[in-house]
Amino acid sequence: MKLISVLITFLLATVIYSQTSPATLKFTVQVYDQFPGFNNNFEPGLGNAITGLIKSTLNSTSRVPELVSTEARIVKNINGGIINPSLFPYFFSPQQDSSLPGQNSPLSLDLIFTYDTTRKIYVYDNQNFFPIDNQGFDVDPAKRIYLNEKKTYHNYHFCMKMNTVFTYKGYEVFNFRGDDDVWVFINNKLVIDLGGLHSPIGTSVDTMTLGLTIGNSYNFDLFFCERHTVGSTIKIETNLLFYCPFKDYCGVCQGDGSSCCNPLTTCNDNNQCTIDSCPSANTIIGPGSIPNYCFHTPKINTNPIDICFNYQCNSSTGNFDPIPIPCLDRSSECLSTIGCNSTVGCQYESICNSNVCNIQNQCSSNGTCVPKSSNDCGIELDGQVDKCKIYSCDSNGGVGCIKEDKCKPSSNPCISTQCNATNGQCYETQIPGDICDCGCGIPENKCKVSWCTPEGICQPKFKSEIDDNNSCTLDSCDPCTGIISHMTAPQCLSCNQCSN
C-alpha cells in the first residue's frame, strides 16, 4: 500500500570531502518496533498526509515530537491516523512494560551510508526497507500476521529516530522524499512536516533561511514511522558535517539505552520492593555487564503516616504491609496495653482496676497495685472511719469493701455488748433476768413468770405479787389459771395481828 521513500540532501563543499571522505559511514539509530495490538495508531483504517500534527518546537528535554492536541476527535488527528493520542509518546520513546498500554520493543539499527564520489555526497538507499523483520515483537511467529498483496510477511510497523549534531558551514541545503510520518527538526525547529499516512512526497529546505550562524553547532533530529502495510523505501543523501556528541552503551547516537537494556528483564533483581531502571544513557560500561550498572531504587511507601504501624515492603508482592509498632512495656506502672489508636498512639489501662480491692489507677513504686486499707474501705463505705467497725475488702465475686461490728455479741443472752463510739472500746452490760431473752418462753405454770439467771439460764420463778408480805394471810396461786388468793390465816381470825 505505502511506499516509504525519504530523500534527505545535506550539501557540503566538494573541496572539503573530495580527498578526505571515507567510502562508507555507519550511523546507529534507535528503532521502536510497534504492534497494532498494543498501539492502535498503527494499521489504522483512516489517514492521509497532514501538516501541523505535531508542535513546531522540539521538546528540549525528551527530544521527541509532541502532538499539538491530545484530543482524538479533532480533524488533524483523525486525518493523520492518530486514533489514540495518548499512545503517541511511545512512537519514539521506550515503553517495555506489557502491563501498560503502548508497549513497544526498542532496537538499534545501523544505517550504512555509501560515498558517491561523483556527486560528493553520502547515500543510504533501500527500496525494500524492512530492517527489523523477525525482530522485536516478531520474534514470536504469532505476531507475523501482516502481509502484502503477494501474501509476503514483513514487519510493517516501526518508528525510527536519529538525533545528532552538525556544524553549520553556511551553504547547506537538503531535499527529501518520503511517505508516512517524516519530521525533521534543525535547531529544535520543525523544518520538515509530513505527518500521517500518505504516498511519497518531496520537499526542499534551504538552511540559509533558518537564521543559523556559520561555525555554530546545531541539533539535527529526524523522526520516521512506518505505520501501515504494504511497502517501504528510504533514501537518504547527506553531506552535512554531522557528528555524534555521545553514544549510549548500546552504540546508538544520543540513544536512551533502551535498545539493549530492558529494566524489566536486564535489570530485574527479583525484588518487588525496588524499581529497576537501566543505567543512564551516557554510562560507560566498564568491567562486568549492563546489569552491574542498573539502578534498584527502593519503592516509596505512599500510605499515610500511621503512628501505630510501620509499613514494610513485601519483596514477594511489592506491597507495603503494615507492621504493628510495639507499644512500650509499662508494667512497672501497673499498666497493660489495650491497643493503638491511629490518632493518639498506644492505649493503656491499669491492671489494678480489675480488682475491686485495689485502689483504682494507683501503682506502688515497685510496680505492684496498692490494696485498699481498712481506712480506705471505711471512707468508701461510710465517708469516714467508724471506730466501732472492722473494715476489710473481699475480692471474691467482686464484693469489694465490707464492714462488721468490732464488738461481737456475747454468747450469754443476758449480757449486752456495746462499743464506745469515741474510742472504739467494747464494754458489757447485764440484762435483768425478767428482760433477758434466754429462751424460757411462757411457763406452763401460770403462777410463774420467765426468768433468766445472770448466766443466761432459764429458771422461771413465782410471780412476785403472790406474796403480799402480810403475815396474816395465806397466799396461794392456781397454777392452771394463775389466780392469786390471799386468805386470812386462822390464827389471825380473832385478832388484828397475827401472832406466831
UniProtKB/Swiss-Prot annotation:
Glycosylation sites: N59, N314, N341, N366, N420, N469
Compartment(s) of residence: Secreted
Cellular component terms (Gene Ontology): extracellular region
Xref: InterPro entries: Fibro_Slime, PA14/GLEYA, PA14_dom, Prespore-cell_inducing_factor, S_mold_repeat
Highest taxon above the source species: Eukaryota
Signal peptide: 1-18
Domain (PA14) ranges: 114-256
Stretches assigned to coiled coil: none
Keywords linked to the UniProt accession: Glycoprotein, Secreted, Signal
Similarity comment text for this entry: Belongs to the prespore-cell-inducing factor family.
NCBIfam families: Fibro_Slime
Protein name in UniProt: Protein psiE
Taxonomic path: Eukaryota, Amoebozoa, Evosea, Eumycetozoa, Dictyostelia
This protein's encoding gene: psiE
